[in-house]
Design a protein with these regions (language model features):
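Expand to "…catalyze enediolate/carbanion chemistry for C-C bond making/breaking, isomerization
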Residues: 1-266
Length: 266
């Protein structure tokens, strides 16, 4: 498995959790159990995509952890929630060792959902792409999500469509006839979130999200600047990673690494 190879590779410090649907946990174990070496003391950390029945999902996770810890540990849960009650009921059922991220839609009750996450001490999730152009939210929609979470002190993660550091126009899948579209950059997202925490205006944040040229961002030991003027220092970046955007998900590990190497950042 690629994940097993990447865990022992030179950039394993960048690697987070393996994402697996709750319904496929047993299938995952059957395929991954031979990838654990006897000397592996850390084990695989898993983020589980919840099924329709959240109580059944939590039960599956609890049983899985009892059987296979410490080689495999489910310590994150990703839940789709469209109502306040879904967030509240899930939060009240979570074991202490399971952190949840709630994927919430930007509909009429969006602000109420973010407020509920804040009250419950939970985290949010935003979907930033897919396999068709219409699956990608606009920069303005992402900024609204980020500013709302920032104002409510709700950390979040992002998933899908973030294979590349900077905004670009690329094929959306690996198929020969794949549709092409504009993909958001994970550096754009992280840095925009950092500047949102410094109370930048929406039009400035939109410019950061839509930057396509590496020269716009300058990195050094002290932090990162945008056009040589506005800066995020190391402490602000540390706080951003802890209390702002925690992680992003990508189908590919090689593409983000190779792109960062091409930019001279690795």
């Amino acid at each position: 498995m690629n994940f097993a190879l990447n865990r022992s590779g030179p950039h394993n410090w960048m690697l987070g959790r393996f994402v697996v649907p709750a319904a496929r946990l047993d299938e995952f174990y059957d395929n991954a159990k031979t990838c654990i070496s006897p000397g592996d003391k850390t084990g695989w950390r898993l983020s589980v995509l919840a099924g329709e029945n959240i109580y059944e999902t939590i039960s599956q996770i609890t049983e899985f952890n009892k059987k296979y810890r410490p080689a495999f540990v489910c310590d994150q849960l990703e839940v789709r929630a469209t109502t306040v009650s879904k967030i509240e009921n899930t939060a009240s059922s979570l074991p202490d060792d399971l952190t949840a991220y709630f994927e919430i839609p930007q509909k009429e009750n969006f602000v109420e959902l973010v407020s509920t996450l804040a009250k419950q001490g939970q985290r949010a999730k935003i979907r930033t792409g897919g396999v068709t152009p219409d699956a990608f939210p606009t920069a303005a929609e992402i900024i609204r999500f980020v500013r709302s979470c920032t104002a409510a002190n709700v950390p979040f993660k992002a998933t899908a469509g973030l294979h590349h550091p900077l905004r670009c126009f690329r094929p959306l899948t690996y198929a020969p006839d794949a549709p092409k579209g504009t993909m958001h950059g994970f550096l754009n997202l992280f840095l925009m979130t950092g500047f949102a925490r410094k109370s930048f205006k929406p039009n400035q944040l939109e410019q950061i999200m839509e930057e396509e040229f590496e020269e716009a961002f300058q990195f050094d030991e002290g932090g990162v600047s945008w056009h040589g003027q506005d800066t995020l220092n190391i402490l602000q970046i540390e706080i951003l990673r802890r209390a702002g955007v925690n992680s992003f998900g990508s189908c590919s590990f090689d593409e983000p690494v190779e792109d960062l190497q091409a930019l001279g950042l690795l």
